[in-house]
Amino acid sequence: SYSELIKLPYSRLPKLFAVKALDAVVFNVPVDPLRPVDKRDNYVKRCMGLPGDTIRIVDRQVYNDQRLMTLPDRSNGQFSYYVRTNGQGFNPGQIKRDFDINYLKNSQVNNQNVSDVLQITQTEFIVTIPEQALEAFSAMMHVDTVIVINALASHQFSEGTPEALIWYYNQAVKPMPMYPNPMGGHSDTTEYAWTRDNYGPLWLPSKGSTISLTRDHVLKYRRSIEIYEGHEFREVNGSYFIDDEPATSYTFEMDYYWMMGDNRHNSWDSRYWGPVPEDHVMGKPVFTFMSWDKYAKGMDKIRMDRLFTVVHGKGKPTSYLLVFLALVALYYGWEIWHKRKQSRQ
């Protein structure tokens, strides 16, 4: 990882289980070209699309081959909302305790610490709210209006849209180019007028599938051909060349997956850098040993209800912490008894 002079072949252990739709998945982030695949940052996102599927997002809802993808029980879906109050602000401690919303001071906000609350005017805020807390949050006495933020492909707003919401959209949402538009581009000049809330359709390549090399396909899949599958790709006078050979089609060598975060409006995921190739997938998280809330105080930093829980499954997760502590106590009890027995002998 310190030099490009020596490159060892990249090999992987065979997989034990296949990735399924809606699984939480651990993978190496694809957009980190300066480091080898296995040295790139590990991300955990939810698989919303499998190889061969077609992904489309309509009004924040994800569709896979026209089937609505509903998040499982143990997910934590969140969106950002425009919130207007009667003039009273929010108490950071209260909304953290009641809704698990992190309201950080400006001095605390950086690339690693993002506040769930952005105050725009004296009475107007952008708030990221967990779906299960939305109804209770909206019922707070001093909350007058709650509007979900839905970025339209047209970048247009209906009559009566609050000026503060338009300002936030133009400053924080609109400038973010969606894949397969160039990352250095701008939403006013992009090829695909897609947004984080209205996206696609985009087909996910599967191993062995073949596409014709049209302009649309080249824009969408050139990154897979060049970066992930390692072929030289050139366009000369409207004709395409792969590894210096004329090409009118391409057959994919890997499967690709669509990964998205449950916090849809604060997630760096496939909407921005495209499908994840199979050689970047590490596995699935199975068990939560420790869950740490860096924004809480004191012992509240440890999320006791999440310790020793199974990641996948139906209903609320069951903590096996007491079972673990009992096993530890039995082990040490046996150790003490065994040593005493040996000393007597």
Model region roles, listed by residue range:
Residues S1-Q345:
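Extended hydrophobic leader/signal-anchor segments used for secretion and membrane insertion
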